[in-house]
Amino acid sequence: MSRLKGAASKIGWAKEHLDHLDREMGEFLNDPYTITRKDKVNEHRHYLRFEFKPIPVSIPLIAGDFCYCLRSGLDQLAWQLARINKVAQPRTATSFPIFSTEPPDGFKDKTKDILPRAVEVIEALQPYHRGAAFKEHPLWLLNELCNIDKHMLFAVHSVAGTVSILNVEVPYRRELQFGFEVGVSLSDKLNVQWEIPKTAIIFGKPANVRGEAFEIEVSTFHTIYRFVEDEVIPEFEAFFK
C-alpha cells in the first residue's frame, strides 16, 4: 500500500482545500448583502438598498487548488500503477486519462506503461460509458474544471431568491446590477423588516469564453471528491497489496 499512499495523500489534501472552501464560502454567505438605508423627507420615503458584496477572490482560487490537487492525485496513481508494472521510469505521458468519447490513441499513450489489469479498471471508469450523459460524470466534471482553471479564474457569482420585505407596503422597487432598492413610507421606517433567502455561489466559465456554458455549485465539488475517494481509489487498492 506504500506506493498508493502518495496518491491517497494528495487526494486527502484536496479534501483540506475543499474544507477550506466551505469555510470561506460559509463566512461570505452568512452575510452576503451590503444593506444601506436613507431618508428622503421631500418624498416622504425611506429607502433600503440591498447589494451583493463582491465575492472574495480567495473562493475561486481555493476551488482551483482543490481541483488540481484531486486531478494530480489521479495522475500520481497512474504513475505508481506503472511503477508496479516494473517500469522504473514511466514515460512522461503516463497519467490518468479522462475521455468523453471512446478511447482515441491518446488513451493508449497515457496508459502504455500501466499494469494491463489496471488499465481495464481505468477504462471502465471513463465518462463515455454514460453515453449522452457523460457530462454528469464526476471525472468529466473534474477534468472540465481543471481545463477552465488552467487558463483563467473560475467565474463566480451569487444567486438568491427574492428578499422579502415584511410588515409594510412597498410602493417602490428598483432593480440594480447586483441587487435592488425599495422605498417605503417614512412613517414605516421603524417597522420594516426583511427576510433574506438562502444564497448560493455559482462557479463556471467566464461569459466571454467560447463554448458551452458551464456552471456548478459547491455541492458538485463534494460529489466529485466522494466519487474519487469512494469509487475510484478502492478499485486500485488490490494492485498495491
Model-derived features: where do they sit?
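Acidic, Ser/Thr/Gly/Pro-rich intrinsically disordered interaction regions
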Residues: 1-241
